């Protein structure tokens, strides 16, 4: 019988919180009691000492020194002074021993209450999101797509004219693709919800409650030892007091930590309230296609998306596995440290280890959460991998209706498709972008005058920076900044004057801020007055403000942003639209998941560190970073046209070749600039370029980029995250990245552009692509591609890096081709 089996229900959580509050009140009462005992012992010892001093004033010397009374009294007064010292020592021992330990125990108990409440709430929120909200959203979308598919099917079957039938067929194919893809997402979501449900009720929640009970029992054991130590120190030798203390000692000895909560559990324990596990809702199939419930659909429409999903899930599983490994190492290390410290710690000092025990329990809980995430991804990977392995090297099965239509295709159409990507392949590569979602933006904000903005938004306010750092920031006489005093709740105006930094404390009285003379309702108004009037800060100093020293322009507060809706997802987290509160600038906000390990968060910030140094019209602009608290944000300009790959697939049919030449010229200009800065992008592709509303292309996604003085970067760690079909042979074989390897990727980007967003090597796996390229194979010329551009592609794909053109040459060549093209 324990917390994990008897208190899994929400009612159990409530009574646990009530119990924690009651125990904290009890501990506070004990602390006040002990503090009063220390105070009374000190006062009593002081009175005895004062009596001894009074007697030493000579009253006893009136009697002969040889008098027995005099000697007895002298001994009495001497022993009284000894008793005074003993009582004073007892009081100090009580204060530094039991009372200090009890205060530490109370702080740890308060922290445990807070940590438990936060972890319980987080587990419930994650369960509700995975098990209810996400599933309901997927089901709602499923029903809508099923209705659309059924309607498109009826229109297709009812169409009589060839033109109408072809148009209805296209719509039906698109609806089928979307339905099958969403069916797969729903299957994966149901599997993830099932695993999360199982882990929550069998591992996560019981583990949390088991950890809580272990810590409570450990605290009960520590409290027992504190009380025993208190009674030993405060015990006196009188028979009456000894009897009382024996009773109290017996009461303290009756404390049994392992049985402390048995009565509580008998009174409040209840059966676990486990809701039914989610299952595939077969009613979703009533209006749509005859799909198998709980089974992935793998056919010619979904094979690419299933392969991509498997790659994505495999990457996420690798990150999750790494997280499990790290947390297992952390738990093992903490357990070993705790064992070593227990061996070297006196039993009465166990309270000193309580903080580490809580850290260990939190690490164990974190390990269970990581194992749950790993299990969900493992289950999804197995579903996807089993389906693809069952397919084998053969072609994916056709959709029955499309197979019938394919038999009726005329021989002339087949000849027209010879040497080109099949119509179905083009359809699949274009269809993902046909219904590109349009995202909304947060509304404009009312702009606030600079002087009316709060203190933390002022450019000259630097927060709690060290005083030593101020001297480095103040360069010229009259330079100033405002900072928060370290260790004190007051603000300081620091100014460089006559070669020395001067620091003036800003006085605050009656909600007015001043140095000398007139007061102002805010510090920004005070600084504005001193700047505009050039009034000396104080008559004695004669210091005048001249120039504000701004803080690092890249540092933003989370409060500086107004987040809009999610517009995408990256390797590290979600991407949102947003605005800057200061001037309504539209921004894109990349977030970093809080659960990522520190090394991955450092890789996330690598993009910002690189972009800080660059300014070019064809490089996406960095606006700032938010690192003051979690989650970490990278704030960049919002390029509203979206990514280049989706743009090609949705708008490509109406684009002229000259426009495409202008856009790849933009890409070449941006890469020429990066080449001049010795920056290696390593992930150049259409998906990582952005398009403005005026069709200007910008290079983006610098998460894999590196800056090397010699222009060569040697990578290690395998190919898990390498985009194989875009990567040069020397980078795949030897991990050698350079501007020349970026040139190879640029050749693939050219091919993507003039094939209007088709996938390179569409019928080859990553390994087959590597073997094909090593044997001298290259992509064919796209239908829309000018011959001069294809020759440039072939130069970019030279096997030897030294034989590839530089980006400067590529840019000049594209400009020349564009001028010649009509």
Curated annotation (Swiss-Prot):
| Organism per entry | Homo sapiens (Human)
- Tell me which domain of life the UniProt entry assigns to the organism this sequence originates from: Eukaryota
Q: Name one Pfam family in it.
A: FCH
Q: What is the effect of changing residue 463 to V?
A: Abolishes kinase activity
GO MF entries: ATP binding; immunoglobulin receptor binding; microtubule binding; non-membrane spanning protein tyrosine kinase activity; phosphatidylinositol binding; protein tyrosine kinase activity
Instruction: Please state how the activity of this protein is regulated.
Output: Kinase activity is tightly regulated. Activated in response to signaling from a cell surface receptor. Activation probably requires binding of a substrate via the SH2 domain, plus autophosphorylation at Tyr-713. Present in an inactive form in the absence of activating stimuli.
Transmembrane intervals? none
Q: Which family, according to the similarity comment?
A: Belongs to the protein kinase superfamily. Tyr protein kinase family. Fes/fps subfamily.
Q: How is it modified after translation?
A: Autophosphorylated on Tyr-713. Phosphorylated by LYN in response to FCER1 activation. Phosphorylated by HCK.
> Where does the protein principally reside?
cytoplasm
Q: What is this protein's tissue specificity according to the annotation?
A: Widely expressed. Detected in adult colon epithelium (at protein level). Expressed in melanocytes (at protein level).
User: Mutating residue 334 to P: what's the consequence?
Assistant: Abolishes autophosphorylation
Subunit comment for this entry? Homooligomer. Interacts with BCR. Interacts (when activated, via coiled coil domain) with TRIM28. Interacts (via SH2 domain) with phosphorylated EZR, MS4A2/FCER1B and HCLS1/HS1. Interacts with phosphorylated KIT. Interacts with FLT3. Interacts (via F-BAR domain) with soluble tubulin. Interacts (via SH2 domain) with microtubules.
Domain topic, free-text comment: The coiled coil domains are important for regulating the kinase activity. They mediate homooligomerization and probably also interaction with other proteins. The N-terminal region including the first coiled coil domain mediates interaction with phosphoinositide-containing membranes.
> What would be the name of the gene that encodes this protein?
FES
The SH2 domain, residue ranges: 460-549
How does the record say this protein sits in the membrane? Peripheral membrane protein
Q: What is this protein called?
A: Tyrosine-protein kinase Fes/Fps
Disordered as annotated region, ranges: 394-421
Ranges where the Protein kinase domain occurs: 561-822
- Catalytic function, reaction form: L-tyrosyl-[protein] + ATP = O-phospho-L-tyrosyl-[protein] + ADP + H(+)
């Amino acid at each position: 019988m324990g917390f994990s089996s008897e208190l899994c229900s929400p009612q159990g959580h409530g009574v646990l919180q009530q119990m924690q509050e009651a125990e904290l009140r009890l501990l506070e009462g004990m602390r006040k009691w002990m503090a009063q005992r220390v105070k009374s012992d000190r006062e009593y010892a002081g009175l005895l000492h004062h009596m001894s001093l009074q007697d030493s004033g000579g009253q006893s010397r009136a009697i002969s020194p040889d008098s027995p009374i005099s000697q007895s009294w002298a001994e009495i007064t001497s022993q009284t002074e000894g008793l005074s010292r003993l009582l004073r020592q007892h009081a100090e021992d009580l204060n530094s021993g039991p009372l200090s330990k009890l205060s530490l125990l109370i702080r740890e108990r308060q922290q445990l209450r807070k940590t438990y409440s936060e972890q319980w709430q987080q587990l419930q929120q994650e369960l509700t999101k995975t098990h209810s909200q996400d599933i309901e959203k997927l089901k709602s979308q499923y029903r809508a797509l099923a209705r659309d598919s059924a309607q498109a099917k009826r229109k297709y079957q009812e169409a009589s004219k060839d033109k109408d039938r072809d148009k209805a067929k296209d719509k039906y194919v698109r609806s089928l693709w979307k339905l099958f893809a969403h069916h797969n997402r729903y299957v994966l979501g149901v599997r993830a919800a099932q695993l999360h449900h199982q882990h929550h009720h069998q591992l996560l929640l019981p583990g949390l409650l088991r950890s809580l009970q272990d810590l409570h029992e450990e605290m009960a054991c520590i409290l027992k030892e504190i009380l025993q130590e208190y009674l030993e120190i405060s015990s006196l030798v009188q028979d009456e007091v000894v009897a009382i203390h024996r009773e109290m000692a017996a009461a303290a000895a009756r404390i049994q930590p392992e049985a402390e909560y048995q009565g509580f559990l008998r009174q409040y324990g209840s059966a676990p309230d486990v809701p039914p596990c989610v299952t595939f809702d077969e009613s979703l199939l009533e209006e749509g296609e005859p799909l198998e419930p709980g089974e992935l659909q793998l056919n010619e429409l979904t094979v690419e998306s299933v392969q991509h999903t498997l790659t994505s899930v495999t990457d996420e599983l690798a990150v999750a596995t790494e997280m499990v490994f790290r947390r297992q190492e952390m738990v093992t290390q903490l357990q070993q440290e705790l064992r070593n410290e227990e061996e070297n710690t006196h039993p009465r000092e166990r309270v000193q280890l309580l903080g580490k025990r809580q850290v260990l329990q939190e690490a164990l809980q974190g390990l269970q959460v990581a194992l749950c995430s790993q299990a969900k991804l493992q289950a999804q990977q197995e579903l996807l991998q089993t389906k693809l392995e069952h397919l084998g090297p053969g072609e994916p099965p056709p959709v029955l209706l499309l197979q019938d239509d394919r038999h009726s295709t005329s021989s002339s159409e087949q000849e027209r498709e010879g040497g080109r990507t099949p119509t179905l392949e083009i359809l699949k590569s274009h269809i993902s972008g046909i219904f590109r979602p349009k995202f909304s933006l947060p509304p404009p904000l009312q702009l606030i005058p600079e002087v009316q903005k709060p203190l933390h938004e002022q450019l000259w306010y630097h927060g709690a920076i060290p005083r030593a750092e101020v001297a480095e920031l103040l360069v010229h006489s009259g330079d100033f900044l405002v900072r928060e005093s370290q260790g004190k709740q007051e603000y300081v105006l620091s100014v460089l004057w006559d070669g020395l930094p001067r620091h003036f404390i800003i006085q605050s009285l009656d909600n007015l801020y001043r140095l000398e003379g007139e007061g102002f309702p805010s510090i920004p108004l005070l600084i504005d007055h001193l700047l505009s009037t050039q009034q000396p800060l104080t008559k004695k100093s004669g210091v005048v403000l001249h120039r504000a020293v701004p803080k690092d322009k890249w540092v933003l507060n989370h409060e500086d942003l107004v987040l809009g809706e999610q517009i995408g997802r990256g390797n590290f987290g979600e991407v949102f639209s947003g605005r800057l509160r200061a001037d309504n600038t539209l921004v894109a906000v990349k977030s970093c998941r809080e659960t990522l390990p520190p090394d991955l968060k450092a890789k996330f910030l690598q993009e910002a560190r690189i972009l800080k140094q660059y300014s070019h019209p064809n490089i996406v602009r960095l606006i700032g970073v938010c690192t003051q608290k979690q989650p970490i944000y990278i704030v960049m300009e919002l390029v509203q046209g979206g990514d280049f790959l989706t743009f090609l697939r949705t708008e490509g049919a109406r684009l002229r070749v000259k426009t495409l030449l202008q856009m790849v010229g933009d890409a070449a200009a941006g890469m020429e600039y990066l080449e001049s800065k010795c920056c290696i992008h390593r992930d150049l592709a259409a998906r990582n370029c952005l398009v403005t509303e005026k069709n200007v292309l910008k290079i983006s996604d610098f998460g894999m980029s590196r800056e090397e003085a010699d222009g060569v970067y040697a990578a290690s760690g395998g190919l898990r995250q390498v985009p194989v079909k875009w990567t040069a042979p020397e980078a795949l074989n030897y991990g050698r990245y350079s501007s020349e390897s970026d040139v190879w990727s640029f050749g693939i980007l050219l091919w993507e552009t003039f094939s209007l967003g088709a996938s390179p090597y569409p019928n080859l796996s990553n390994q087959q692509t590597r073997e094909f390229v090593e044997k001298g194979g290259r992509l064919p010329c796209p239908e829309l591609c000018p011959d001069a551009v294809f020759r440039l592609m072939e130069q970019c794909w030279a096997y030897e890096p030294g034989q590839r053109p530089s980006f400067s040459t590529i840019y000049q060549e594209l400009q020349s081709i564009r001028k010649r093209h009509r």
